[in-house]
Amino acid sequence: MQKQAELYRGKAKTVYSTENPDLLVLEFRNDTSAGDGARIEKFDRKGMVNNKFNHFIMTKLAEAGIPTQMERLLSDTECLVKKLEMVPVECVVRNRAAGSLVKRLGVEEGMELNPPIFDLFLKNDALHDPMVNSSYCETFGWVSQENLARMKALTYKANDVLKKLFDDAGLILVDFKLEFGLYKGEVVLGDEFSPDGSRLWDKETLDKMDKDRFRQSLGGLIEAYEAVARRLGVKLD
């Protein structure tokens, strides 16, 4: 399957059309951003690591009964996916307090959250992805209440699957975001799951193994990504 026209260039991925109107190519680039794209740097191997990481996770979620847009890997940095009508709202699950939750509520970083917190954010960099709720989604027509309920259920199911997967690899799944779309009327998991959109800590040391290493200028970003991938059993080379 050959990529054709560039349809969209995001902060770290480029989307291309194919000869099949129902399929797209996602290309993972080496770009890494923080501050809603205000700071961008390139890291060798990052596109490859995230592409293979994402394929691995999407495969695990599909095996657990979660519908995903993933079709197959095409190359080190590209995968073939179903074309979705994306919902402009992203779902976040928090198992421990970190990031914006700590800033907003003043709670201690690392505090266990039981049950996990479910948040919704409007995908809009210019507005810094404001938090919204189901009432906003209904009023502004972003997603139906039925589909939103399905998104929430699938997000919690993904959390159950991934918490165990990472725990078995000696990692804490602190939080993560998921994006969904519609494929022929069905809610389907889209975009990606990688250390770019999740927080992962080492279970013993609590070392951060995700994009916070870039956000907080801790260094060792790709080394951390590759370490997480190898612990999970992702074949990188």
UniProtKB/Swiss-Prot annotation:
Pfam families: SAICAR_synt. Signal peptide: none annotated. Its EC number is 6.3.2.6. Keywords: ATP-binding, Ligase, Nucleotide-binding, Purine biosynthesis. Pathway: Purine metabolism; IMP biosynthesis via de novo pathway; 5-amino-1-(5-phospho-D-ribosyl)imidazole-4-carboxamide from 5-amino-1-(5-phospho-D-ribosyl)imidazole-4-carboxylate: step 1/2. One of its GO terms (molecular function) is ATP binding. InterPro entries: SAICAR_synt/ADE2_N, SAICAR_synt_PurC, SAICAR_synth, SAICAR_synthetase, SAICAR_synthetase_CS. It catalyses: 5-amino-1-(5-phospho-D-ribosyl)imidazole-4-carboxylate + L-aspartate + ATP = (2S)-2-[5-amino-1-(5-phospho-beta-D-ribosyl)imidazole-4-carboxamido]succinate + ADP + phosphate + 2 H(+). GO terms for cellular component: cytosol. GO terms for biological process: 'de novo' IMP biosynthetic process; cobalamin biosynthetic process. SUPFAM superfamilies: SAICAR synthase-like. NCBIfam families: purC. Belongs to the SAICAR synthetase family. This is Phosphoribosylaminoimidazole-succinocarboxamide synthase.
